[in-house]
Amino acid sequence: MAVVTLAEMMEAGAHFGHQTRRWNPKMSRYIYCARNGVHIIDLVQTAVCMNNAYKWTRSAARSGKRFLFVGTKKQASEVVALEAARCGAAYVNQRWLGGMLTNWTTMKARIDRLKDLERMESSGAIAMRPKKEGAVLRRELERLQKYLGGLKTMRRLPDVVVLVDQRRESNAVLEARKLDIPLVSMLDTNCDPDLCEVPIPCNDDAVRSVQLVLGRLADAINEGRHGNNEQRGGGDAEG
């Protein structure tokens, strides 16, 4: 059975690429045609790639690999958080901070600081501080929660990075490749398929397209971990 149908992808608008002048020639094998100055992605190729990505991701999850979802653009942010949480993956959905992977020791210290501040807040310790000091601590807490909240369950570097927008998340791509962390990437027509191990050619700007792809990948992770496809079920938190 196909992981995703052509009808589902059409309905999600997964076939719409970018303007032809913005294309990357390396994506030519995934492009069906051009209409009104816009490239149309070959959804037959996308379906094949989705099947491959599902199997690859399921196998990685079955072998205990840990996943990091990355997507900071407005239309992807909420979906990234929801689907990552559903399959127990870590996520970055606000802004990629330089060194999130390549300077992991420092980043882990910031995550530990976030956990400490959350414990202080829940225990009432911050409320007991002088008003000015408490305000400073709460501002620090809010900032850390915004940018690092999705990484609290990540005790070490991820084994796989799942990416929504390769061009926007170019720093994440560079860091993952520097550390030889494989990338499962949604690729619009302006992307470079050579910069990822598992390509998924599709519209990476439409919310429904992002929902469709990340939803299936989250299903694959849950199936790999739990032995069945737990659609819309809760995933285990990464420990």
UniProtKB/Swiss-Prot annotation:
InterPro entries found in the cross-reference section: Ribosomal_uS2, Ribosomal_uS2_bac/mit/plastid, Ribosomal_uS2_CS, Ribosomal_uS2_flav_dom_sf
Top-rank taxon, per record: Bacteria
Gene3D superfamilies linked to this entry: Glucose-6-phosphate isomerase like protein, domain 1 (3.40.50.10490), Helix hairpin bin (1.10.287.610)
Keywords noted in UniProt: Ribonucleoprotein, Ribosomal protein
Signal peptide, first to last residue: none
One Gene Ontology cellular component: cytosolic small ribosomal subunit
Coiled coil keyword on record: no
A single GO molecular function term of this UniProt record: structural constituent of ribosome
Family recorded in the similarity comment: Belongs to the universal ribosomal protein uS2 family.
Entries under HAMAP family matching the protein: Ribosomal_uS2_B (MF_00291_B)
Protein name: Small ribosomal subunit protein uS2
Species of origin: Parasynechococcus marenigrum (strain WH8102)
